[in-house]
């Protein structure tokens, strides 16, 4: 079994419900168990206009190889209506394969670790929450990368009821 981390994000529709559904779908993948789920975080879109994103990270133990796991993540995105009209477009669901153990892969369809994860608080804050000692191959400790991104707004969101978010600065 490998330990994989998947970043989740959405900013169209009911983002919270979409992320919860996607986590359930990840848990149903063959030979895969969800071991941890971060809190949800609200973040502004990167290089684009649109509603704030809701982001999270899950830790998976899986026997799937990274390419197969990525293909299944893309299939889950498609099932949730994901379209790619242009870079940084608003999305119903975005699933990013961030890390698989300490694998370093660079192919036409898969790059591990995720090539921009070390630059994104919305990835690192939830990752560090569930894996405080996570290391990004070639970049160092995730928490050290996060410390360099204090200017990026990334707010942990606590829901007491499905429709009533409360913010908790992180």
Residue ranges and their predicted role:
Residues 7, 59-61, 100:
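Short hydrophobic/aromatic beta-strand micro-patches
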Residues 14-16:
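Short N-terminal binding/cap micro-motifs at the start of the first secondary-structure element
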Residues 8-10, 62, 128:
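Short, structured patches in soluble enzyme cores that scaffold and shape functional sites
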Residues 21, 25-65:
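Short, surface-exposed acidic-centric catalytic microdomains
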Residues 11, 37, 126:
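Residue-level signal for inorganic ion chemistry
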Residues 1-6:
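Extreme N-terminal starter segment of soluble prokaryotic enzymes
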């Amino acid at each position: 079994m490998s330990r994989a981390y998947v970043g989740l994000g959405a900013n169209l529709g009911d983002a919270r419900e979409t992320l919860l559904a996607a986590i359930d779908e990840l848990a149903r993948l063959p030979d895969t168990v969800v071991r941890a789920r971060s809190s949800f975080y609200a973040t502004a879109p990167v290089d684009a206009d649109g509603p704030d994103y809701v982001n999270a990270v899950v830790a998976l133990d899986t026997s799937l190889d990274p390419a197969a796991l990525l293909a299944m993540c893309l299939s889950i995105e498609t099932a949730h209506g994901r379209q790619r009209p242009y870079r940084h477009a608003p999305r119903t669901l975005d699933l990013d394969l961030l890390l698989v153990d300490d694998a370093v892969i660079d192919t036409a369809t898969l790059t591990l670790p995720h090539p921009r994860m070390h630059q994104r608080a919305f990835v690192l804050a939830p990752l560090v929450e569930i894996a405080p000692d996570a290391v990004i191959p070639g970049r160092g400790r995730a928490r050290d990368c996060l410390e360099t991104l204090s200017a990026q707004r990334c707010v942990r969101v606590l829901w007491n009821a499905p429709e009533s978010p409360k913010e908790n600065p992180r």
